[in-house]
Amino acid sequence: MDYTLDPSMTTMTDYYYPDSLSSPCDGELIQRNDKLLLAVFYCLLFVFSLLGNSLVILVLVVCKKLRNITDIYLLNLALSDLLFVFSFPFQTYYQLDQWVFGTVMCKVVSGFYYIGFYSSMFFITLMSVDRYLAVVHAVYAIKVRTIRMGTTTLSLLVWLTAIMATIPLLVFYQVASEDGVLQCYSFYNQQTLKWKIFTNFEMNILGLLIPFTIFMFCYIKILHQLKRCQNHNKTKAIRLVLIVVIASLLFWVPFNVVLFLTSLHSMHILDGCSISQQLNYATHVTEIISFTHCCVNPVIYAFVGEKFKKHLSEIFQKSCSHIFIYLGRQMPRESCEKSSSCQQHSFRSSSIDYIL
């Protein structure tokens, strides 16, 4: 959904209107006046997302050792967010200068963005289905919720689906010179306008409508089951995933709504100069909001995850003990024992596993 690289709509490059499809109305268009501020914004997002999601991966791999299928999904979700922000360093340079990385990297960077978006939404959807099975169909879940199922079958299927959904979006990406400035963007003319509308609806359907429908079904069933059974352990088991789902919807729904309205505008169902300018402005705002989601999940884990902060503390203590040993010092015995608990502590894996 990287409209950051679509010059006809976003903050990432100057406006360009192929043929007469999106010719500017009379009056001032929304232009990018503060490139430096936007570049700083991308840098901050990249740093915080890289740090936060790397810590999540470290906790899952080192402390929890990927003991259950939920850990596998959380690991893939963190990888999706990292893939999403891979484009930010390129976009930062793009803000300050021009696209100097060539056509291949134009498609590759855009591809990482789209794959990161799709895979993130798909894994959140998969986690919701997983919680549904664990709570509503606990006996059946014990049979199907295996590490092998999560790592080989479902995870690979999600990544493959995300890649396949991305390919049509990359066909029209190219590098061209506008007023002597190299730009990376998706180009549509009168003949290919239908593909722009198709890809917009594809993102609406695959990135929001289908996941949202599954979310609603799963959590209505889960809440009904919890209301009937009053199981405190099951309530704790779904809380974190539910918060992640709600946060993702809050960050992505506004952009998808604007994307849908933009498709209607391209089809001339919505028309007029005022609507065009309002959609351009709304795209700027909702795009920036959606970008921020890549930093949110680690923050949620830190505040909601019961064991996440504990695992981070154990990793930090263990690192400190190694530093002290390297420096020829000794830590107090109690600290050393606590630092080693990260590897010695065992977690019970069942159909209702605790998350971080």
UniProtKB/Swiss-Prot annotation:
GO terms for cellular component: external side of plasma membrane. One of its GO terms (molecular function) is C-C chemokine receptor activity. The keyword Transmembrane applies. Residues 64-73, 130-146, 224-239, 306-356 are cytoplasmic. Gene3D superfamilies: Rhodopsin 7-helix transmembrane proteins. Residues 1-35, 94-107, 173-203, 265-281 are extracellular. The chain crosses the membrane at residues 36-63, 74-93, 108-129, 147-172, 204-223, 240-264, 282-305. It is a multi-pass membrane protein. Keywords: Cell membrane, Disulfide bond, G-protein coupled receptor, Membrane, Receptor, Transducer, Transmembrane, Transmembrane helix. InterPro entries: CCR1-9-like, Chemokine_CCR8, Chemokine_rcpt, GPCR_Rhodpsn, GPCR_Rhodpsn_7TM. GO terms for biological process: calcium-mediated signaling; cell chemotaxis; immune response; positive regulation of cytosolic calcium ion concentration. Disulfide bonds join 106-184. May regulate monocyte chemotaxis and thymic cell line apoptosis. Belongs to the G-protein coupled receptor 1 family. PANTHER family: C-C CHEMOKINE RECEPTOR TYPE 8, CELL ADHESION MOLECULE. This is C-C chemokine receptor type 8. It comes from Macaca mulatta. The lineage of its organism: Eukaryota, Metazoa, Chordata, Craniata, Vertebrata.
